[in-house]
Design a protein with these regions (language model features):
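Short, acidic/polar
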Residues: 19-31, 91-109, 156-160, 183
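N-terminal binding-site loop/beta-alpha segment at the start of enzyme catalytic domains
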Residues: 1-69, 73, 131, 206
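Short, well-ordered amphipathic alpha-helices
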Residues: 50-60, 102-106, 136, 159-163
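Structural motif corresponding to the early beta-alpha repeats
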Residues: 66-95, 120
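Beta/alpha (TIM)-barrel catalytic core signal, keyed to glycine-rich beta->alpha loops juxtaposed to Asp/Glu
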Residues: 121-279
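Active-site groove signature of glycoside hydrolases
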Residues: 106-126
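Active-site mouth loops of central-metabolism enzymes
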Residues: 10-22, 83-96, 126
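A structural motif
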Residues: 35, 111-114, 145, 170
Length: 279
């Protein structure tokens, strides 16, 4: 799919959080199996961004070229960092923190541009969030970043304000996809109105009750597919880009196979009702 910024974004992304020493191997495997979008963050607490870069470099040495890939990383505010391992000067002004984090990401990922830079979470105040966004806009102006996004944004009012106030509007929203937020129905509606790509994480982990539901099981049985494949297929048919962080090559293959089948209209309605998408 193509974003409002004109950037091609794969319909399924490989997420690299919490992979630690296995990061490089798993990124190599994901790209070898056919993933073309990688999500990471400049946040040593949960991501090994340099090992993501090593895995990408290996793939680029086996026939892929940089334009074949969609590399998305995040600026993580100080509140989300391990204070003993912050990838920028925590005493620096916020715009400088963002600039330092961006430069670290370029080094880690061994690239000279990012396809998307995501603000990992809103800042404590709207003023700070807009200040961070303007610093990120300057990186787009300098052609180091192709588009911008925001993560962990569950407030439709905040997202709407950002869309109005930003000079470069968000192209991506990435949120946890779970029942506690009503599956982000309000946020997703705003994303549709503003032509923002909605990305979901914790899509499987947070939803065992969906995966175990008879509506999903019946579709999986009819199609000869797994419950995760059915849920992912429903989401891509409904303008959601899921992240998968599987460590299993077999599951990587299953995830990529969601493009090989379609749900029936009755199955879409039944699963949609579970997520509140249909009455």
């Amino acid at each position: 799919m193509t974003s409002v910024a004109g950037v091609r974004v794969p319909r399924l992304l490989y997420g690299t959080a919490w992979k630690k020493g296995d990061t490089e191997r798993l990124v190599e495997a994901a790209l070898a199996e056919g993933f073309r979008g990688i999500d990471t963050a400049c946040q040593p607490r949960h991501y090994d961004e340099a090992s993501v870069g090593a895995g990408v470099a290996h793939a680029l040495g086996t026939g892929l070229s940089r334009p074949d890939l969609y590399l998305q990383t995040k600026f993580t505010p100080l509140s989300g960092q391990d204070r003993s391992n912050v990838p920028y000067d925590p005493r620096a002004p916020l715009p400088e923190q963002i600039a330092q984090s961006f430069e670290a990401s370029l080094r880690n990922l061994r690239t000279d541009y990012l396809d998307c830079l995501v603000l990992h979470s809103p800042l404590p105040t709207l003023t700070q969030t807009l200040q961070a966004w303007r610093a990120m806009e300057s990186l787009v102006d300098a052609r180091g970043v192709r588009q911008l996004g925001i993560s962990n944004c569950y407030d439709s009012t905040l997202l709407g304000t950002l869309c109005r106030e930003a000079r470069i509007k968000p192209a991506v929203v990435q949120n946890r996809f779970y029942a506690e937020t009503g599956y982000d129905r309000g946020i997703r509606a705003l994303c549709r109105d503003e032509r923002i790509i909605y990305q979901s994480f914790w899509t499987l982990t947070a939803n065992p009750h969906i995966l175990d539901h008879p509506a999903v099981a019946e579709a999986a049985s009819r199609l000869g597919r797994t419950a995760p494949q059915v849920l992912f297929r429903y989401l891509i048919e409904n303008e959601v880009v899921p992240l998968t962080g599987t460590r299993s090559v077999e599951h990587m293959r299953e995830d990529l196979a969601i493009f090989d089948f379609e749900l029936s209209s009755d199955e879409r309605r039944a699963i949609g009702r579970l997520l509140g998408d249909h009455a």
